[in-house]
């Protein structure tokens, strides 16, 4: 019985993949809300990580994000994803205005039958809460997006990975004349996520 309990408390490869994929689901929703990419009335409040977070009620967006998160979970489990990037662009000109980059490190020695890593869910959630709080706080320094914007998700994977048909190849979509701000990181001991946001420096007329 004691052995079973310790397995439940530890972090397994599959459990780690689920934790990180879930973070991206809430993190992307937070970015889309904070940056006004979708109307605020299309979001609803939920409790997660000891915070009140906003998630979309837009059915098309829910479907899209669910598909992305499920695919991401699989790639995280296989340790074959290197980074996820949320790109925010001016709808009219296509110019990239913000680039939220999450670098993902994976301990490839972790296997299904490996002993669970000793880190509590609470410790991981505390770290994730700090990252989400920082995403929320970025509105205090990021330039106001005064034009209509859209977003793209870029996922960098190992070169030999088979990618689903609906996914398209993309360039890195970097920003010209940008500032970068590093955000906090979190780790499950199997996956580590480092966060940063780059934004276009406003030009004074």
Swiss-Prot record:
Component of the spindle-assembly checkpoint that prevents the onset of anaphase until all chromosomes are properly aligned at the metaphase plate. In the closed conformation (C-MAD2) forms a heterotetrameric complex with MAD1L1 at unattached kinetochores during prometaphase, the complex recruits open conformation molecules of MAD2L1 (O-MAD2) and then promotes the conversion of O-MAD2 to C-MAD2. Changing residue 153 to A: Leads to formation of the closed conformation. It comes from the Eukaryota. The gene is MAD2L1. The keyword rRNA processing does not apply. Its main location: nucleus. SUPFAM superfamilies: The spindle assembly checkpoint protein mad2. Changing residue 191 to A: Prevents formation of the closed conformation and interaction with CDC20. Phosphorylated on multiple serine residues. The level of phosphorylation varies during the cell cycle and is highest during mitosis. Phosphorylation abolishes interaction with MAD1L1 and reduces interaction with CDC20. Phosphorylated by NEK2. Monomer and homodimer. Heterodimerizes with MAD2L1 in order to form a tetrameric MAD1L1-MAD2L1 core complex. In the closed and open conformation, interacts with MAD1L1. Formation of a heterotetrameric core complex containing two molecules each of MAD1L1 and of MAD2L1 promotes binding of another molecule of MAD2L1 to each MAD2L1, resulting in a heterohexamer. Interacts with MAD2L1BP. Interacts with ADAM17/TACE. Interacts with CDC20. Dimeric MAD2L1 in the closed conformation interacts with CDC20. Monomeric MAD2L1 in the open conformation does not interact with CDC20. Keywords: Acetylation, Cell cycle, Cell division, Centromere, Chromosome, Cytoplasm, Cytoskeleton, Kinetochore, Mitosis, Nucleus, Phosphoprotein. It is found in: Nucleus; Chromosome, Centromere, Kinetochore; Cytoplasm; Cytoplasm, Cytoskeleton, Spindle pole. Residues 14-197 form the HORMA domain. The protein has two highly different native conformations, an inactive open conformation that cannot bind CDC20 and that predominates in cytosolic monomers, and an active closed conformation. The protein in the closed conformation preferentially dimerizes with another molecule in the open conformation, but can also form a dimer with a molecule in the closed conformation. Belongs to the MAD2 family. The keyword Cell cycle applies. It comes from Homo sapiens. GO terms for cellular component: cytoplasm; cytosol; kinetochore; mitotic checkpoint complex; mitotic spindle; mitotic spindle assembly checkpoint MAD1-MAD2 complex; nuclear pore nuclear basket; nucleoplasm. Gene3D superfamilies: HORMA domain. The modification Phosphoserine is found at residues 6, 130, 170, 178, 185, 195. This is Mitotic spindle assembly checkpoint protein MAD2A. Residues 195-205 are annotated as: Required for assuming the closed conformation and for interaction with CDC20. Changing residue 75 to A: Prevents interaction with CDC20 and leads to formation of the closed conformation.
């Amino acid at each position: 019985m004691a052995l079973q309990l310790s397995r439940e408390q530890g972090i397994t490869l599959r459990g780690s993949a689920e934790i990180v994929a879930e973070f991206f689901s809430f993190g992307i929703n937070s970015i889309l809300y904070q940056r006004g990419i979708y109307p605020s009335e299309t979001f609803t409040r939920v409790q997660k990580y000891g915070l009140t977070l906003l998630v979309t009620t837009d059915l098309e967006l829910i479907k899209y994000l669910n598909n992305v998160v499920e695919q991401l979970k699989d790639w995280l489990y296989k340790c074959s994803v290197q980074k996820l990037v949320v790109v925010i662009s001016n709808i009219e000109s296509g110019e990239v205005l913000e680039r939220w980059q999450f670098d993902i490190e994976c301990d490839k020695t972790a296997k299904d039958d490996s002993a669970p890593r000793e880190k509590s869910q609470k410790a991981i959630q505390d770290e994730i809460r700090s990252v989400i709080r920082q995403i929320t706080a970025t509105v205090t320094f990021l330039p106001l997006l005064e034009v209509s914007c859209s977003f793209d998700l870029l996922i960098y994977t190992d070169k030999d990975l088979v990618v689903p048909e609906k996914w398209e190849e993309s360039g890195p979509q970097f920003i010209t004349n940008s500032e970068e701000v590093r955000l906090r990181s979190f780790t499950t001991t199997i996956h580590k996520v480092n966060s940063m946001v780059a934004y276009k420096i406003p030009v004074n007329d």
